[in-house]
Curated annotation (Swiss-Prot):
Main location (coarse class): cytoplasm
A biological process from GO: glycerol metabolic process
Name of the gene this protein is made from: glpE
Annotated Gene Ontology cellular component terms: cytoplasm
Originating organism: Pseudomonas savastanoi pv. phaseolicola (strain 1448A / Race 6) (Pseudomonas syringae pv. phaseolicola (strain 1448A / Race 6))
Name used for this protein in its record: Thiosulfate sulfurtransferase GlpE
Listed transmembrane segments: none
Amino acid sequence: MTEFKRIPPEQAQALREQGAVLVDVRDAQTFQSNHIPDSVHLDNHSIADFIAKADLDKPLVVVCYHGNSSQSAAAYLVGQGFSDVYSVDGGFELWRATYPDETVQG
């Protein structure tokens, strides 16, 4: 894959169940207050370390607030060598509306 794909929350959940890595690019405080279980918070401070330790061929699902910022982040991650990248349309807000029991705090 040379470009990322935009996917709905249902497809993101299916990928998550198959072992995909979920990264959340919202701000740290918002991430702490509510996020998808087992997702990784990714920001300018953590991205280099994340990339260095990541399996570039493992599916990577990017989520933000509403599905806009995640597209830029997904494109960047493709440029860094990730081969299977997805951006969640509707972001965390649509995820939370679709899967209200699939969020955690802290």
